[in-house]
Curated annotation (Swiss-Prot):
Organism: Agrobacterium fabrum (strain C58 / ATCC 33970)
Sites of N6-(pyridoxal phosphate)lysine modification: K234
Gene that encodes it: glyA1
Sequence similarity: Belongs to the SHMT family.
Matches recorded under PANTHER family: SERINE HYDROXYMETHYLTRANSFERASE, SERINE HYDROXYMETHYLTRANSFERASE 1
InterPro entries: PyrdxlP-dep_Trfase, PyrdxlP-dep_Trfase_major, PyrdxlP-dep_Trfase_small, Ser_HO-MeTrfase, Ser_HO-MeTrfase-like, Ser_HO-MeTrfase_PLP_BS, SHMT-like_dom
Protein name, entry field: Serine hydroxymethyltransferase 1
Enzyme class (EC, first level): transferase
Location in the cell: Cytoplasm
Listed cofactors: pyridoxal 5'-phosphate
């Protein structure tokens, strides 16, 4: 076999056994662990095939029909399909599907609408916001004057009176609504009324809830917002990436220019092809059933945790996620994440509102149901999962050490493997 033949023929296992081995181990982890990280999901075989396709070879700077390279006629088809499907999915007139990530989609909107030093408002990180919503360690907090709003201390719900008061005091150029750890319904209409009163743009980051919006389980930010951004993974169940949506043609032109050439060069055409596939899947009737089940499962999980003696921030959830306050179990988020991980339950430590602990320790964990729902889990399974979580945390409380309770974790791990074996994923692999 010539070198050229080998280049096009040798499989990964032969070319790079180290990477192949890591992928095989990751497949085993995903098959046997319960994934409760709210920002993660499991894509279809079709999405995997599109993302792993030969479209990865193609440079395509520009937009469909207006490229800086030749040979783009077929990647144009993929991007045009992604755009049209995104528009249909969210009922909007314009979509940019090129952002490589959630951070880049938000940066593109800032680049289009703000100048360095301008004021914008965003949800405080400790109340469930995102780094790109004005955190001082992020570009958004370094380049702009950020006015943060938060939740009320009593019920941990958004303090809309505070939003209105701060908006009137500071006259921001943009108000950003949306978050990564807020479990209740957003009042887009009230946000728009406040934005109009002070002459601000309303931007909605619906990265976490876009799948629920598409599936009819959360109110759409349109027609209230000027622009919405969303990642394409999470509850949308697509490849990792971002997009920008609007009904305003003038703003759409600004966003297109901000993405390219403002922030990015050549778009990732294999990822855009996979986005198109995922949007097509989300347009099918069964996706509405999926979104409804995600919410049902989250409610079942939250109720079970509360019955087990845990506090759920704001008292429950209306969407796919919940923040669990661990202080009643004398646990930190760091300890709980590690203990649950040893029991094959994957989650992430997360700050809770007014958290006394440091960001890398935290008093809480964030749990979500999209990935488990994709596997086929329903309320009964999530009630079982809730009981297993309580079992691990009770064992951790008794042990009162970073090492956890080995016997309890081993027993739960065995139950988890039994549960996940009933819901296989990627059987062809």
């Amino acid at each position: 076999m010539s070198n050229t033949d080998a280049f096009f023929s040798r499989p990964l296992a032969e070319v790079d056994p180290d990477i192949f081995g890591a992928i095989e181990k990751e497949l085993g982890r995903q098959r046997h662990e319960i994934e409760l990280i709210a920002s993660e999901n499991i894509v279809s075989r079709a999405v995997l095939e599109a993302q792993g396709s030969i479209m990865t070879n193609k440079y395509a700077e520009g937009y469909p029909g207006k490229r800086y390279y030749g040979g783009c006629q077929f990647v144009d088809i993929a991007e045009e399909l992604a755009i049209e499907r995104a528009k249909k999915l969210f009922g909007v007139n314009f979509a940019n599907v090129q952002p490589n990530s959630g951070s880049q989609m938000n940066q593109a909107v800032f680049l289009a609408l703000l100048q360095p030093g301008d004021t914008f408002m965003g949800l405080d990180l400790n109340s469930g916001g995102h780094l790109t919503h004005g955190s001082p360690v992020n570009m958004s907090g370094k380049w702009f004057n950020v006015v943060s709003y938060g939740v009320r201390e009593g019920d941990n719900l958004l303090d809309m009176d505070e939003v209105e008061r701060k908006a009137k005091e500071t006259r921001p150029k943009l108000i950003l609504a949306g978050g990564t750890a807020y479990s209740r319904v957003w009042d887009w209409k009230r946000f728009r009324e406040i934005a109009d009163e002070v002459g601000a743009y309303l931007m909605v980051d619906m990265a976490h809830i876009a799948g629920l919006v598409a599936g009819g389980q959360h109110p759409s930010p349109f027609p209230h917002c000027h622009v919405a951004t969303t990642t394409t993974h999470k509850s949308l169940r697509g490849p990792r990436g971002g997009m920008i949506l609007t009904n305003d043609e003038d703003l759409a032109k600004k966003f297109n220019s901000a993405v390219f050439p403002g922030l990015q060069g050549g778009p990732l055409m294999h990822v855009i092809a996979a986005k198109a596939v995922a949007f097509g899947e989300a347009l099918q009737p069964e996706f509405k059933d999926y979104a409804a089940q995600v919410v049902k499962n989250a409610k079942a999980l939250a109720e079970t945790l509360i019955e087990g003696g845990l506090d759920v921030v704001s008292g429950g959830t209306d969407n796919h996620l919940m923040l669990v306050d661990l202080r009643k179990k004398n646990a930190t988020g760091k300890r709980a994440e590690a203990a649950l991980g040893r029991a094959y339950i994957t989650c992430n430590k997360n700050g809770i509102p007014f958290d006394p602990e440091k960001p890398f320790v935290t008093s809480g964990v964030r749990l979500g149901t999209p990935a488990g729902t994709t596997r086929g889990f329903k309320e009964a399974e999530f009630r079982e999962i809730g009981k297993l979580i309580v079992e691990v945390l009770d064992g951790l409380k008794v042990a009162n050490s970073d090492e956890g309770n080995a016997s309890v974790e081993a027993a739960v791990r065995e139950k988890v493997v039994g549960l996940t074996d009933r819901f296989p994923m990627y059987p062809y692999m």
